[in-house]
Structure formats: structure tokens, C-alpha cells
Amino acid sequence: TTEGKVIKCKAAIAWEAGKPLSVEEIEVSPPKDHEVRVKIVATGVCRTDEHAINPSFKEGVFPVILGHEGAGIVESIGQGVSKFKPGDKVIPLYMPQCGHCKFCLNPKTNLCEKISKIKTPISDQEVMSDGTSRFTCKGKPIYHFMGTSTFSEYTVVSESSLAKIDAAAPLDKVCLIGCGFSTGYGAAINTAQVEPGSTCAVFGLGGVGLSAVMGCKAAGASKIFGIDINKDKFPLAKKLGATDCLNPQDIRKPVQEIIAEMTNGGVDFAIECIGNPDVMKAAFESTTVGWGTCVIVGVAVGEQSIPFSPMQLIMGRKIKATFFGGWKSVKSVPKLVSDYMAKKFDLDALVSHTLPLDKINDAFDLMNAGKSNRTILVF
């Protein structure tokens, strides 16, 4: 047994910004009080992982083990842990749910005060609660990422950053519930609160955007526009529920004007899944005056602003944003896994590539070239 011992294993380390990740042997310490050590079985690669090593993101810390969309099996537990035992299937949660802070006790939000830097959550939780790391490589401590660090064969997480899931769940699919799927699907269901018979537009058809399309369809939308500059994304978007797909580069006028023409003045709901302020503006302007709602999902790196006029708000449009799709994580993730097992939605369609950890830089290249929806790394 490895319980109580340091584990040597492989992990992908980001040593500095703008450089490829390096797969190295690391040491993972045993879990301390209220911590759990998890053997990661599969992890998705998300745009947010790329943001964290982007030179324009000034909050990044190095060296760091990225990854926040994983699934695995509990290897051992620290003192005081009662909800988990070795062998449990689990999903690490970058959005913790402690269950007793002012946010956890309020049904209006899924935030938790354990995310201490609510200003820039993707640079948060880079050490454990005692201020130290559980990872070392070549004698150096390595930072954690978002409290999860799933680009490692073993990771250590807080017990409030972990959900126990169905023992029969396929970890190489349900890992997507750790971020991308839940974020997009929840943006439609929870944050936008898409209504039956409504019209929707989803900007950006990567893994998150395709999940938002699924959410709009599940909520009963009658028309769902999928917008992307990569037309290779359109066939899958249509399979998952998009009724119309538009490429802004093929249109002579702004896409929001085309959408307004096709919907008698604009859609009821728009969801931006890219993280580009100009696209956020287009999404907002594609909604109808009177009651249009725009939900921002994409993470914009650095000091950027959305350029729109306050007058557009006076005319009854609303702009909202979402983090982890509005799901209270510990409570909702097991239910989402059960819904997947009951075939209420199709995660398998989102997985375009499966690669070993050693090929992690290929996964980033595929994502940056727009050639993947979601790549899963299997250990």
C-alpha cells in the first residue's frame, strides 16, 4: 500500500509562461488533515489551462501542474475526512463547496469563499490551506492549479473540492463534468434559464459552446444559432441541437445584424463561450431589446473591457456571467454524472481525441489549431 507514503509518478509541469509543458517524475506527499490523495485516471484539456500559461496572463505562478477537468479514484485520505474512502470514484472540483460559508448557504450563487481571490479565480488555490504544496520535482516545490492539478498521475485536493460519483461511471467521459460540459450546459439551464420555445445564439462551438447548445436544446429552445469562424464545428453543433450555423467571416455585415433579421429583432438568449470582448459585444447585441439576456461564459485574459453603451441596458437587455455553469459543485456533480449514466445528454460526442499524458502538448496544439472539441488524456 502507498498510504502514508510519498508517491513518485509522472506529471506535466509548466516551468514558465509561453513554453510547452514538460512531463517529469514528481513526488506527491500524503494528504494532510481534511485532504484527499487521488489517482487521476483521465483529464480533459481546457482553454483555461492554456490561459494560465499565456504570457499575457500576469497572475500565473510557476512552476505549476495545471489541469482542472479530471476524474479518478481515491488513493488515501487525511485525518478528519469522513465522506471519502480509498477506492471511491471522484471528480476534483475547482469550484469548492465547503457547505457553511455565506455563499454556500445562499441558493443564489455557486461560489464558495474557499476561492479566496474571487477577482481572478484561475490564479487561485495554488497552494493547500496550510500554505504549502504537496508536489515536488527535482527538489523544488511545484504549485497547484485551481486546487485540482489533474495533469498528474496523483494529486492532492481539499475534501471540499471533491465529489464522490457513481462507481460505474466511465472516468474518461465524466471527467468533462469537472469543467467544460457543466459550464456550458449550466450556462443555458441555470444562468440564462432558457425557456421552452425561445430563440438562442451560442457564440463559440468548442467543448463549452457545444455543451451550451445541448443545454439550450434540453431546455426546449425552438431555434438555436451556433456561431463560429471554424465551419468544421458546424456538423457536430447541428447533431447536438443547433438549428442554424453562421460563420461571421462569410457575412458582409456584423453577425448580430443577421441574427436580428432572422429572429424579428434578436434572440431571447445569447451565450458567449470564447472569452473575447468583441464577441461578448456581438452576443449582447444579438439579443432582443425588452428582455434579451446575454450570458458570458468565456474567460477574457488580462485587463480587457466589453465595449457597449449603457443605453443598450436601459432598453431592457441583461448581461450576466457564469462560473462553473452555476452548479453548486459538491451537490450537483454527482447528479450530473447520474444524468449522463441515464443517457440524458451525450458527453461522448464532445470527445474528439484521446491521448496519453506524454502527448499533452499535442492536445494543446490541436486545441489552438481548432482541430479538437475536447481531448482527453488517459493515464
Curated annotation (Swiss-Prot):
Gene Ontology annotations of biological process type: fatty acid omega-oxidation; formaldehyde catabolic process; retinol metabolic process
Reaction equations catalysed: all-trans-retinol + NAD(+) = all-trans-retinal + NADH + H(+); 9-cis-retinol + NAD(+) = 9-cis-retinal + NADH + H(+); 20-oxo-(5Z,8Z,11Z,14Z)-eicosatetraenoate + NAD(+) + H2O = (5Z,8Z,11Z,14Z)-eicosatetraenedioate + NADH + 2 H(+); 20-hydroxy-(5Z,8Z,11Z,14Z)-eicosatetraenoate + NAD(+) = 20-oxo-(5Z,8Z,11Z,14Z)-eicosatetraenoate + NADH + H(+)
GO cellular component terms, A-Z: cytosol
Entry annotated with the keyword Transferase: no
Swiss-Prot/TrEMBL keywords: Acetylation, Cytoplasm, Lipid metabolism, Metal-binding, NAD, Oxidoreductase, Zinc
Entries under SMART domains matching the protein: PKS_ER
Binding site for Zn(2+) 2: C98, C101, C104, C112
SUPFAM superfamilies given in the database record: GroES-like, NAD(P)-binding Rossmann-fold domains
This enzyme's EC code(s): 1.1.1.105
Principal location class: cytoplasm
Cofactor remark: Binds 2 Zn(2+) ions per subunit.
Leader sequence segment: none
Cofactor: Zn(2+)
Pfam families: ADH_N (PF08240), ADH_zinc_N (PF00107)
Residues that bind Zn(2+) 1: C46, H68, C179
InterPro entries recorded: ADH-like_C, ADH-like_N, ADH_Zn_CS, GroES-like_sf, NAD(P)-bd_dom_sf, PKS_ER
Record-listed NAD(+) binding positions: G204, L205, G206, G207, V208, G209, D228, K233, V297, G298, V299, R374
Family to which this protein belongs: Belongs to the zinc-containing alcohol dehydrogenase family. Class-II subfamily.
Subunit-level organization: Homodimer.
Summary of the function given for this chain in its UniProt record: Catalyzes the NAD-dependent oxidation of either all-trans-retinol or 9-cis-retinol. Also oxidizes long chain omega-hydroxy fatty acids, such as 20-HETE, producing both the intermediate aldehyde, 20-oxoarachidonate and the end product, a dicarboxylic acid, (5Z,8Z,11Z,14Z)-eicosatetraenedioate. Also catalyzes the reduction of benzoquinones.
Name of protein: All-trans-retinol dehydrogenase [NAD(+)] ADH4
Source taxonomy: Eukaryota, Metazoa, Chordata, Craniata, Vertebrata
